[in-house]
């Protein structure tokens, strides 16, 4: 067996500023920024245990260690790693009040999601070319980097039909660098960084008071969200299972999943190529209707109906066909 421990400390501070300048009576510019400094320190330890007592041993029997490695891909290790990041994120928003019933805006902003360390207990240490295990040096995949994004958006908000109807629209485009993608690996989720990806789309929504008692609503979205070059994505559970069978036959790939090895020839993981894969539903929307009426005794009764529709999409970042929502 094995006993695993995980501990992480995070220290962070940030400075934020935002201000608005009126260029004209109907034109204003809002600008701001956020500066963040973050430090993380992780302590990850896995001990192999005596099969009879369950007690951890710093010097496991080499045969027991070999069985653990062959069966579960797990080696005794102790990692003490730290990382720090600092990010400056500006934001700008230009708003134009064209009339009492129409407003337009254009905005640009940057953001980030901090990197960190994977907490699953089967993280493996590094190996030298001669097969020596460096138990205090983490192998590939233990740490993942910050995800950063820059976003552009333009849109409008309108009041129509003497206030009985509102209509809003927005077009957006976001570019991600080192996008963080979570993949289930059997004992937990592992986060890895994808190559650059782009997310763009158009959203429209409408609400209308059709009568004194009836209110209608609708919204529709078109989304184009694809991975860039992402040839190091985690394999699906089915692919990983097929790969184990392939390795037993001396092959290094199966079902689009390729084995990865250390310099010593030890398997250190697996990956697949999902470059250009779609990340979300291309089309989605809702339709709604609400009808209400006042009864003679002052009570209100109402009837509501909602319809939601969406295109096919993957529920997981590894684009597992079994996780397609239709």
For each predicted feature, which ranges?
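Short sequence motifs at beta-strands and strand-loop junctions characteristic
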Residues: 3-12, 23, 39-41, 80-88, ...
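Face-selective signature of the C-terminal outer-membrane beta-barrel domain
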Residues: 1-54, 79-80, 84, 95, ...
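Gram-negative outer-membrane beta-barrel transporters
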Residues: 25-26, 164-166, 170-175, 192-317
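Membrane-embedded beta-barrel scaffold of Gram-negative outer-membrane proteins
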Residues: 97, 103-113, 119-121, 127-202, ...
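Solvent-exposed loop segments that connect transmembrane elements
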Residues: 1-5, 41-82, 118-142, 181-192, ...
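A general lysine-centric signal
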Residues: 37-40, 91, 113, 157
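Hydrophobic, lipid-facing positions within transmembrane beta-strands of outer-membrane proteins
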Residues: 11-19, 88-94, 140, 150-154, ...
């Amino acid at each position: 067996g094995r006993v695993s421990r995980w501990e992480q400390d995070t220290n962070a501070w940030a400075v934020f500023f935002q201000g608005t300048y009126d260029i004209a009576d109907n034109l204003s510019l809002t600008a701001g920024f956020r500066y963040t400094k973050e430090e993380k320190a992780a302590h990850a330890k896995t001990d192999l245990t005596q099969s009879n007592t369950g007690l951890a041993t710093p010097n496991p029997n080499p045969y027991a260690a070999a069985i653990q490695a062959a069966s579960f891909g797990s080696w005794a290790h102790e990692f003490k790693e730290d990382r720090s990041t600092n990010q400056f994120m500006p934001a700008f928003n230009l708003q134009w009040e064209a009339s009492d019933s129409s407003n337009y805006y254009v905005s640009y902003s940057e953001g980030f999601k901090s990197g960190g360390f994977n907490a699953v207990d089967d993280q493996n240490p590094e190996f030298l070319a001669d097969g020596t295990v460096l138990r205090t040096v983490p192998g590939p995949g233990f740490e993942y980097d910050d995800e950063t994004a820059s976003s552009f958006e333009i849109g409008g908000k309108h009041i129509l039909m003497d206030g009985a109807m509102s209509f809003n629209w927005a077009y957006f485009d976001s570019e991600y660098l080192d996008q963080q993608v979570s993949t289930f690996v059997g004992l937990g989720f592992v986060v890895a960084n994808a190559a650059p990806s782009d997310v763009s789309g158009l959203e429209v929504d409408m609400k209308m008071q059709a009568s004194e008692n009836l209110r209608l609503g609708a919204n529709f979205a078109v989304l184009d969200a694809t991975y860039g070059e992402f040839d190091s994505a985690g394999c699906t559970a089915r692919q990983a299972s097929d790969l184990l069978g392939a390795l037993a036959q001396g092959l290094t790939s199966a079902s689009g999943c390729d084995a990865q090895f250390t310099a010593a020839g030890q398997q250190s993981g697996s990956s697949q190529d999902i470059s250009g894969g779609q990340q979300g539903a291309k089309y989605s929307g809702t339709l709604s209707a609400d009808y209400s009426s006042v009864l003679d005794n002052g009570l209100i009764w109402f009837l509501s109906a909602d319809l939601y529709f969406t295109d096919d999409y993957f529920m997981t970042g590894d684009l597992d066909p079994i996780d397609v929502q239709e």
